[in-house]
């Protein structure tokens, strides 16, 4: 059946693709089959990895436009691959700058829908505003609906794990698994992977040993990941109490990184990785979209913010001029440290911040208080429901905290309940699909 209508999904980064686009387009495809053509258009974003189009092509969509062609599309309505456009359609904003969705909808003559987690902008020029949670919206002609969190639908879309990782590794069904999620970008992996491997060493020496697995980000190959565990390729290993590892890719079984201590950290490449994450007892992760994905699956986690990154990290989650300056090679490292401490000072107040600076040893608990919450579930809840560890992190101390949780399953169960409460119930994707199809019907008039 030839499609008669077009749905153009705008997005910008791996996190938005995994937590917003994937549930939406999967639900949409199940609902409409081939009656509607689904196009994904990647928009400019300073935090994008450059591999977003490749990730989106794995989803049930008809075509994907990489970010390098976005401006040509917006200005000329054409693409290098000669895309055509159906007479009726809708542009659905699922990440990036909301203005891009407004402008592209005007250019194509389509309806415009915004999914808004925090704040709706350009409300006078859109047709539908779908809100994650109730929030004030200025008077507008747009239809406004509260639909919930798209990420909750990950729970229903994630199939049960087959095969079970424990079976593949010959482990007992009751063996707890720990997921190590060190990130997908160089600025996080340079320190995150060596630290994760050192944590795995500590867990392997526990009684009984606790196996670890790394869900490999879709933007990484095994070879590119392993380079961050090689001191020749990653000189930042000297900045953290991490360890090295060597990559092994056996013909039978999962590939793995092996540390000098002999610890094997298994590498999981199946995408989406939700079936694996459902198997783990707890995850160790950096800040970012990982915390939102884990929360959507109700997976307990410990979130790491290593202070060692102040000396080497150039890219970070803050937007604006500071984000651009941090990316400059000449001043990046010093500016990152400056921005970090300014944020701490802003959160604590200058008087308390001055006390932190004057103390012989840094009070990292105060620093953490000044930074505020960084993990998404904590931001949503307004309180710490998953632990955030800030400071010059010690792999042994992190491992001990993980072992504590594994030895106290009631605490893990309570964390799961808290995550489920803050994320909410599934159904947002279906609601957004119905809003979209309703607008397509309006477009027929």
Model feature map: region roles:
Residues 1-445:
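Nucleotide-activated sugar donor-binding and catalytic core shared by glycosyltransferases
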